[in-house]
Each structure stands twice: as C-alpha cells, then as structure tokens.
C-alpha cells in the first residue's frame, strides 16, 4: 500500500461537523410532526445515509418528512460546530499541495451555509445514488483528477468506508472520542488532525 497521497475525501456530518445530535433531533421532530415516534436508536445508525432512504423506512410520504427535518436542521444550524482541529488541518493539507473534497449525504442547500476550505464538494443532490454506493466518491475522484489508490477517505461510520474499500482508496475511521472500530478501516484515528500522521506514515513506507 506504499504510495504518495495526492488527495483526501472527507465525510461531513459527524466527521468534520459536530452535528450528529442535531441531525437526530431534526429527524425525531420531523417524524413526530407526521404522527410517527421513531426512537433515537433506530435513527442514529441511519445518519450518513441519504435522508430519503431513512424516511422511507418509517413513513409513506418520505420526501415531506425529509424536507421538514432539513428545515429544522437549517434553522438550528448555528448549534453545529466544526470539530476544533478541522480548519487548521484543512489549511495544512492545502499547504502540502494535497487536494481535498467533501462527499456527503447532506443536501447542497445545507452545505451552502458553511464556508469550508476544500477544493470540491459532492452532495446528495449531485448524484443519482448516495453512499454506500461508490458513485459520489467516483465523482469526487474525477473532480480531483487523482486515482483512487492515491486518495484517503475519512469518515465516522462504515457507510463512509465501504465504498472507499470497494474503490481501493485508503479508508480511515475517525473516532472523535467514541469507542468504535471497523473492519473496513485501514487506519483508525482519534481526531481529524491525526490524518496528517497517516499521510506521513504512508510517505515513510513509500520511501523504504
């Protein structure tokens, strides 16, 4: 797996943005508005999937529910913050000449609320199939102009890592203090800044 890393693709919710709890609350309130009480433990594993897929599991009018939760999320977006090491890490990647992208199941209207210094953004609105299908990653790789083998994918759930493994990207699970692990991860890191250590490690392997 020795190679030079030329790009990093990040998931957004739960990876760069500390927003999972807000997203869960938004879904619960949206379902409740339509008379459906969906427990948190059923919503949480679906965060990161296309919203329409989550809604379809519980209601017959999934688009209406999805749009309502997006509306709640947008109205309360100020409570969601980037993890503290995100901005300096993105700046360091840019300094090193490493291309960056975000691949997210979030809609573009939400992403437009954030000023994020990455080269490319692929939202659920830009593809016909969302994660875990590889399509969003293929689109990002094409935009970045690099092969999958020279790209790292960073995510906080297996839904982010499964398509990365299919494409032979290097998959990295970021924990953010959670006691989690994944068989789909080539590396596991505690925070976003640790991705720089992964890149350095791969560079050392390449020079041996």
Swiss-Prot record:
Active site per database record:
11 (nucleophile)
Could you list this entry's UniProt keywords, alphabetically sorted.
Answer: Hydrolase
Q: Provide the GO biological process annotations.
A: DNA repair
UniProt record similarity statement: Belongs to the HAD-like hydrolase superfamily.
Q: What does this protein do?
A: Catalyzes the dephosphorylation of the artificial chromogenic substrate p-nitrophenyl phosphate (pNPP).
Q: Which PANTHER family match?
A: PHOSPHOGLYCOLATE PHOSPHATASE
* Protein's name in the database: Phosphatase Ta0845
Q: Which organism is it from?
A: Thermoplasma acidophilum (strain ATCC 25905 / DSM 1728 / JCM 9062 / NBRC 15155 / AMRC-C165)
């Amino acid at each position: 797996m020795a190679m030079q890393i030329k790009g990093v693709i990040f998931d957004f919710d739960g990876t760069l943005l500390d927003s999972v709890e807000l997203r869960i609350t938004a879904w619960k309130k949206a379902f409740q508005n339509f008379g459906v009480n969906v427990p948190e433990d059923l919503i949480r594993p679906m965060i990161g999937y296309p919203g329409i897929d989550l809604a379809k599991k519980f209601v017959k009018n999934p688009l209406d529910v999805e749009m309502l939760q997006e509306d709640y999320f947008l109205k309360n977006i100020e409570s969601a913050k980037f993890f503290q090491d995100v901005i300096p890490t993105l700046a360091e990647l840019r300094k090193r000449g490493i291309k960056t992208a975000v691949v997210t199941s979030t809609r573009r209207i939400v992403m437009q609320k954030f000023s994020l210094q990455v080269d490319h953004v692929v939202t659920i609105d830009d593809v016909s199939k969302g994660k875990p299908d590889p399509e969003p990653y293929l689109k990002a790789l094409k935009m970045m102009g690099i092969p999958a083998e020279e790209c790292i994918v960073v995510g906080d759930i297996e839904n982010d890592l499964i398509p990365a493994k299919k494409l032979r990207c290097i998959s990295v699970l970021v924990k953010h203090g959670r006691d989690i692990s994944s068989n789909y991860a080539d590396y596991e890191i505690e925070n976003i800044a640790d991705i720089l250590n992964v890149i350095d490690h791969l560079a050392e392997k390449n020079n041996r």
